[in-house]
Curated annotation (Swiss-Prot):
UniProt-recorded Gene Ontology molecular function terms: antigen binding; identical protein binding; SH2 domain binding; signaling receptor activity; transmembrane signaling receptor activity; virus receptor activity
Protein name according to UniProt: Signaling lymphocytic activation molecule
Residue spans, topological domain Extracellular: 21-237
Organism: Homo sapiens
Residues annotated with Phosphotyrosine modification: 281, 307, 327
Disulfide bond positions: 158-228, 164-209
Keyword Iron-sulfur assigned: no
Main location per the UniProt record: membrane
PANTHER family: SIGNALING LYMPHOCYTIC ACTIVATION MOLECULE
Topology versus the membrane: Single-pass type I membrane protein
Signal peptide residue numbers: 1-20
Motif ITSM 2: chain residues: 325-330
Task performed by this protein: Self-ligand receptor of the signaling lymphocytic activation molecule (SLAM) family. SLAM receptors triggered by homo- or heterotypic cell-cell interactions are modulating the activation and differentiation of a wide variety of immune cells and thus are involved in the regulation and interconnection of both innate and adaptive immune response. Activities are controlled by presence or absence of small cytoplasmic adapter proteins, SH2D1A/SAP and/or SH2D1B/EAT-2. SLAMF1-induced signal-transduction events in T-lymphocytes are different from those in B-cells. (Microbial infection) Acts as a receptor for Measles virus; also including isoform 4.
Name of the encoding gene: SLAMF1
Length: 335
């Protein structure tokens, strides 16, 4: 191919690409300015620029529409009004307010479904001007939270994996940095995870997790070394076992002492009963007038002897009964 022809073809392709980048289907403009706002807040969309604002007085009709994409052939009408006519705008949807003085569209309590392309058309007698912009809504990011997801200790070093998370926010980007450092830490693919290997020389290190999206940012600091300190319960389990063993021994000693005390009380009661046993000797003699008659019976003892062993009452705890023996000598009456 002729070099001049090749150059001409290249120029034509360049113009085609430039035209396609500026216009979509039906000649719609593609390079719409992008407006970023916070989700849920009131949004004001300036649907104009200086040149359109100057020619607004010559317009006979204004239409504001919204589309989910520039390639979509269907648009939702939001505002339709004639500047020369008095009265409120027509077809004004809920939560919308149009300010004619500066051609600004207000959206109350913005929602995700409000995202899209907003187009304003100014119709004149013989011409039409169009202006568009793209609205993107983002949820504000909350304060991040840093947690230790994994910890290992070996040879005096501590290896940690930190995780940084947020409860609220979309399209969130994460970055890590050290408070005393001059250069940010760069985990793989700006991950919310950070791996650290620390030693005693890093005891004062403080790390910062920063979260951000196109409309907001927030950060949180974290000192990991306190979580790496040696836990006595982990490194000295023998102390726990020694304490348990000592407790068991003390319980056994107390049980033995109680048993010995009970046996001592029982022996004391038995000894006391034996010591306090009394023997009573009683002698009974018949009246005097019979003394003469009894002389004829020298072999018989005129006296009666009674032996009685008396004991004190036995405590209730002692169930053994003591027997009482009575020895009596009885003489026969005189016939």
């Amino acid at each position: 191919m002729d070099p001049k022809g090749l150059l001409s073809l290249t120029f034509v392709l360049f113009l085609s690409l430039a035209f396609g980048a500026s216009y979509g289907t039906g000649g719609r403009m593609m390079n719409c300015p992008k407006i970023l706002r916070q989700l849920g807040s009131k949004v004001l969309l300036p649907l104009t620029y200086e040149r359109i604002n100057k020619s607004m007085n010559k317009s006979i009709h204004i239409v504001v529409t919204m589309a989910k994409s520039l390639e979509n052939s269907v648009e939702n009408k939001i505002v339709s009004l004639d500047p020369s006519e008095a009265g409120p705008p027509r077809y004004l949807g809920d939560r919308y307010k149009f300010y004619l003085e500066n051609l600004t569209l207000g959206i109350r309590e913005s929602r995700k479904e409000d995202e899209g392309w907003y187009l304003m058309t100014l119709e004149k007698n013989v011409s039409v001007q169009r202006f568009c912009l793209q609205l993107r809504l983002y949820e504000q990011v909350s304060t991040p939270e840093i947690k230790v997801l994994n910890k290992t200790q070996e040879n005096g070093t501590c290896t940690l994996i930190l995780g940084c998370t947020v409860e609220k926010g979309d399209h969130v980007a994460y970055s890590w940095s050290e408070k005393a450092g001059t250069h940010p830490l760069n985990p793989a693919n700006s991950s919310h995870l950070l791996s650290l290997t620390l030693g005693p020389q890093h005891a004062d290190n403080i790390y910062i997790c920063t979260v951000s999206n196109p409309i907001s940012n927030n950060s949180q600091t974290f000192s990991p070394w306190p979580g790496c300190r040696t836990d006595p319960s982990e490194t000295k389990p023998w102390a726990v076992y020694a304490g348990l063993l000592g407790g068991v021994i003390m319980i056994l000693i107390m049980v033995v002492i109680l048993q010995l005390r009970r046996r001592g009380k029982t022996n004391h009661y038995q000894t006391t009963v034996e010591k306090k046993s009394l023997t009573i000797y009683a002698q009974v003699q018949k009246p005097g007038p019979l003394q003469k008659k009894l002389d004829s019976f020298p072999a018989q003892d005129p006296c009666t002897t009674i032996y009685v062993a008396a004991t004190e009452p036995v405590p209730e705890s002692v169930q053994e009964t003591n027997s009482i023996t009575v020895y009596a000598s009885v003489t026969l009456p005189e016939s």
